[in-house]
Every structure is written in structure tokens, then in C-alpha cells.
């Protein structure tokens, strides 16, 4: 008592299924393009970072970068700031959320006093989550 559902379908019958192979091909190409382009859309301020052998941490969706160049000029993202305007710019960028992690990028030639001054300013303003950014190097064996 077997039942055949496609008894009348011969080799010349039309197939009514949607072919999704081209759609999948396009999606994979777009995925590759976005994976290549995403790291390029970060911060363009050139800073000579110190090396580190620690395990890299995962990135948040919208990281906030505070950069200090060798000449002690500061940038939030790609926008230049001064000591006086730094906290105002951070408050505007983070919408006043003090629990936002600030990724601190400093050139390796910046003196310790400048680093501590900037970190103290962040601390006094209520930004307690500060991540220090460094270059990845091969682990010592």
C-alpha cells in the first residue's frame, strides 16, 4: 500500500523550487568583503604602540579610543582634543555612560607623567574602565 506522490512527474515536467545557490554565493562574497573592510574602519591616528605578549581581549561593538601621540597631542577617535575638552568630548561620545571602557593608546615614547595625568583625569571624571592598548608580539619561548 505504498503511495506515490509524484506519479505523473516525468523528465520534461517543470520544477517549481527556488534555486538559492546564487543567493548564497552573493551572501558569502558580501561576508568576505565586510570581514576585510571592518578592521580598516578603526582609528587612523598613527601611534607607535609598545609591544605586549598578553592574550588579546575581544573588542566591543563601538570602541572608544583615546590616543596620545609622541608630541603629547591627544585624540578621541580621529578628533583632536585638549586637556580641557577631553572629558566633554568623552561625555558626548559615550552619552554620559561612565561604565564605558576607554581604550587608551599611547605612543611608547610618551613619558609616564603624561600617561598618569590623562588616566587621573579620566578617573576623576568617573571613567574607571580603562583598557591599555599595545602591539601584539610573538610569545617568548
UniProtKB/Swiss-Prot annotation:
Report the leader peptide range: none
Q: Which UniProt keywords apply?
A: Bacteriocin transport, Cell inner membrane, Cell membrane, Membrane, Protein transport, Signal-anchor, Transmembrane, Transmembrane helix, Transport
Coiled-coil residues are: none
Membrane topology type, per the record? Single-pass type II membrane protein
Q: Which residues lie on this side of the membrane: Cytoplasmic?
A: 1-22
Kindly list the GO CC terms recorded for this protein: cell outer membrane; membrane; plasma membrane; plasma membrane protein complex; transmembrane transporter complex
GO terms classed as biological process: bacteriocin transport; cobalamin transport; intracellular iron ion homeostasis; intracellular monoatomic cation homeostasis; protein stabilization; protein transport
InterPro entries linked: ExbD, TonB_ExbD_1
Query: Which residue stretches are annotated as topological domain Periplasmic?
Result: 44-141
What parts of the sequence cross the membrane?
Answer: 23-43
Pfam families this protein is in? ExbD
Keyword Kinase attached: no
**The keyword Protein transport belongs to this UniProt entry's keyword annotation:** yes
Induction section of the entry: Induced 2.1-fold by hydroxyurea.
Q: Where does the UniProt annotation locate this protein? A: Cell inner membrane
Q: Which GO terms describe its molecular function?
A: energy transducer activity; identical protein binding; protein homodimerization activity; transmembrane transporter activity
| Cited NCBIfam families | ExbD_1, PRK11267.1
Any idea what job this protein has? Involved in the TonB-dependent energy-dependent transport of various receptor-bound substrates.
Q: Quaternary structure? A: The accessory proteins ExbB and ExbD seem to form a complex with TonB.
Q: Which family does it belong to?
A: Belongs to the ExbD/TolR family.
Q: What is this protein called?
A: Biopolymer transport protein ExbD
Taxonomic source organism: Escherichia coli (strain K12)
* Organismal lineage: Bacteria, Pseudomonadati, Pseudomonadota, Gammaproteobacteria, Enterobacterales
Amino acid at each position: 500500500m505504498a503511495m506515490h506522490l509524484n506519479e505523473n512527474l516525468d523528465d520534461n515536467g517543470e520544477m517549481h523550487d527556488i534555486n538559492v545557490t546564487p543567493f548564497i554565493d552573493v551572501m558569502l562574497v558580501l561576508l568576505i568583503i565586510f570581514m576585510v573592510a571592518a578592521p580598516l574602519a578603526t582609528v587612523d591616528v598613527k601611534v607607535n604602540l609598545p609591544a605586549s605578549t598578553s592574550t588579546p581581549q575581544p573588542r566591543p561593538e563601538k570602541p572608544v579610543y583615546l590616543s596620545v601621540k609622541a608630541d603629547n597631542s591627544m585624540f578621541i577617535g580621529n578628533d583632536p582634543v585638549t586637556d580641557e575638552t577631553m572629558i566633554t568630548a568623552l561625555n558626548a561620545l559615550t552619552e554620559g555612560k561612565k561604565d564605558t571602557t576607554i581604550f587608551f593608546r599611547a605612543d611608547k615614547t610618551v613619558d609616564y607623567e603624561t600617561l598618569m595625568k590623562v588616566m587621573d583625569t579620566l578617573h576623576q571624571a568617573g571613567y574607571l574602565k580603562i583598557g591599555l592598548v599595545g602591539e601584539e608580539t610573538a610569545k617568548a619561548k
